[in-house]
């Protein structure tokens, strides 16, 4: 078995590439996937998004993830440099997954359900920003300079 660094097997780079690609795919898709399902979401929580008082819910449900990701990505990149990129990436994966699962378990309706979904989208944004901030650095660390 050949190694790039002492204690790191050669196939580590391919595992790192696969895992970071999956994480980035999830985080990127999640930034816009809600747009497709908005009619079903608002039907499910029995809320009309086009009523003036409910437009805020619509906007935050769409933009909450992207705002949090844009704000936090640089911070989590630096935190990953200080405490370990893989640790931050794995933590981001866990936070993102917990936010996704919690959002899928919304059983109530009305404005409270919309606020809960917005909060879970923000949690997903925190996890997604950890994924985005550290995935490229993990790949850079895993592959030798000549590849």
Residue ranges of predicted features:
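Transmembrane-helix bundle of Major Facilitator Superfamily
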Residues: 2-147
């Amino acid at each position: 078995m050949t190694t790039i660094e002492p204690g790191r097997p050669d196939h580590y780079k391919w595992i790192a590439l696969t895992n970071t690609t999956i994480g980035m795919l999830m985080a990127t898709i999640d930034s816009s996937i809600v747009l497709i399902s908005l009619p079903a979401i608002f039907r499910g929580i029995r809320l009309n998004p086009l009523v003036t008082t409910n437009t805020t819910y619509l906007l935050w449900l769409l933009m909450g993830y992207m705002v949090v990701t844009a704000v936090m990505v640089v911070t989590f990149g630096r935190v990953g440099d200080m405490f370990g990129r893989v640790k931050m990436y794995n933590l981001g994966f866990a936070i993102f997954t917990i936010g996704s699962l919690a959002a899928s378990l919304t059983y109530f309706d009305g404005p409270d359900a919309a606020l809960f979904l917005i909060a879970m989208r923000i949690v997903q944004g925190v996890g997604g920003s950890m994924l985005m901030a550290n995935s490229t650095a993990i790949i850079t660390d895993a592959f030798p300079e000549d590849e």
